[in-house]
Amino acid sequence: YFEIEDVQRKALKSAIECHDIVLMDRIVDALPLSEQDKLAIKQLPLLNGKEDLLQKLYDFPRSEQSHSAIDNLEEIYRILKSYGFSDYVRFDLGIIRDFNYYTGMVFEGYAPGLGFPLCGGGRYDRLLTEYGHPMPATGFALGIERLLLTLERQGGRVPSPSKNFYVGYGE
């Protein structure tokens, strides 16, 4: 939607990812955009909240692509709500991934008593394209050490490993 040079886009993405608001403001102020667009870029990464946040996003300048992204988030929320997970969903527009293969929504999973993500993932349709197999994909990674730490902090039993298993695959 915004016409931004690749170097500026990468610098802005890095500032948002590191939550460096001062640097983000400097980068945005130097962009050849309207004041309204600059304000929107500065505000979006700071937005987070529940379902009502999605409605607020429609007030921002948007393109067909951003409108589609909001619609996608609303659909994901409806599905999660239908499974009874609405109390556990919070939208944070400041979460972005460093990898260029992500193509849609990204997420992080948290547990009570743990101040950092237990898992993270998202939609990454470009990942397999990098290996010559274009295909849509969604997935996540779960931090085993973080899972064990969460179990320990919540008074759960941390099982002792009994056997090591190795799985290999090849053609």
Kindly label every feature range from the protein language model.
Residues 18-19:
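Short helix-adjacent coil turns
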